[in-house]
């Protein structure tokens, strides 16, 4: 796994290779210390990203954000512009990397704005690395209204992590004056059900809502306690292996897989990561699970209670604080 881990992620190793040394150092300072992004380096960063992306067959880019829909959103744009001579050239500027203006009128907003106030802004989050899905360069971003209100889950999370670091650092100074910041770590556990695609297609309630709304208990539920940590079925294990390979290529550090308590319920858990990155990886993994499951003639159910009479799927969040001194 270490050979292909983060193969499609513009991580620090890729940054060091594709960026000028002074640009690399400034960008690392932004990531590690939260300093303000210098717009003067944006063009150089964008050029490095584009070069790496094109070497991996990428033709499009997108600002990848998390609106209030319990999923992710993206709009793909090609790396093409007119060259002024009747032809086209590939182009990706720092301006396109740092900020875009997607239409925000049709996203949930909690009633804080009118529908006709359509403008929204997506802004690059440098602390979460850029990655490649198929032929698209995905740039993690926050999503806000033109008046500054958050229209996503990432912006409030980043604000809370900053506030928590400041408060925790003040406490640490009573004991360790050398502490400069406190990082929040997160290890999530993704539980899910797998259903054969043919059986899924026979249930309109599953197709429309992702859970059962009618029917009765199956002949055997979880009374025998024989599914938890049991032998993983061969077909399910093939799905898990495929999922883990693709997840590792996207930098998601998958660690544990096993049968859960309910029949056809399973779990995947990663190694702890910085909280913002861990949340991005969980959102990415849930999207990836659906794609890989379809390839193996499964449908994955992520609803917290898809079946009555058996355990639901929780998402335990193992949360901790860590100082910059270790």
Which residues does each PLM region occupy?
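Catalytic pocket of metal/acid-base enzymes, prominently hydrolases
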Residues: 1-24, 119-139
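Alpha-helical protein-protein interaction elements
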Residues: 2, 56-57, 184, 258
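Histidine/acidic residue-rich metal-binding segments in metalloenzymes
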Residues: 3-94, 98-114
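Glycine-rich, acidic/polar active-site loops that bind/position phosphate-bearing ligands
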Residues: 118-303, 307-326
């Amino acid at each position: 796994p270490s050979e292909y881990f983060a193969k499609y992620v513009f991580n620090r190793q890729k940054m060091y290779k594709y960026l000028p040394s002074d640009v690399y150092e400034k960008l690392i300072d932004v990531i590690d210390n939260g300093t303000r992004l210098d717009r003067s380096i944006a063009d150089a960063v964008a050029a490095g990203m584009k070069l790496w992306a094109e070497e991996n067959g990428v033709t499009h880019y997108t600002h990848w954000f998390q609106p209030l829909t319990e999923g992710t959103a993206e709009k793909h744009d090609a790396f093409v512009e007119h060259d002024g001579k009747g032809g086209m050239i590939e182009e990706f500027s720092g301006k396109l990397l740092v900020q875009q203006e997607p239409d925000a009128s049709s996203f949930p907003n909690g009633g804080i704005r009118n529908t006709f106030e359509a403008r929204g802004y997506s802004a690059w989050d440098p602390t979460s690395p850029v990655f490649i899905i198929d032929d698209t360069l995905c740039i993690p971003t926050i999503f806000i209204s033109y008046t500054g209100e958050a229209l996503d889950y990432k912006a409030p999370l980043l604000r809370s992590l900053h506030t928590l670091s400041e408060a925790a650092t003040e406490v640490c100074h009573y004991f360790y004056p050398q502490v400069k910041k406190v990082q929040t770590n997160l290890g999530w556990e993704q539980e899910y059900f797998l259903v054969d695609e043919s059986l899924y297609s026979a249930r309109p309630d599953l197709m429309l809502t992702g859970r059962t709304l009618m029917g009765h208990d199956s002949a055997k539920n979880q009374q025998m306690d024989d599914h938890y940590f049991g032998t993983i079925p061969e077909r399910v294990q093939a799905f898990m292996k495929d999922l883990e390979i693709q997840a590792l290529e996207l930098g998601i550090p998958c660690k544990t897989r096993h049968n859960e308590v309910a029949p056809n319920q399973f779990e995947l858990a990663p190694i702890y990561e910085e909280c913002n990155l861990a949340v991005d990886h969980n959102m990415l993994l849930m999207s990836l699970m659906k794609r890989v499951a379809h390839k193996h003639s499964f449908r994955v159910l992520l609803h917290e209670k898809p079946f009555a009479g058996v355990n639901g799927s929780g998402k335990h969040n193992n949360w901790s604080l860590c100082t910059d001194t270790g």
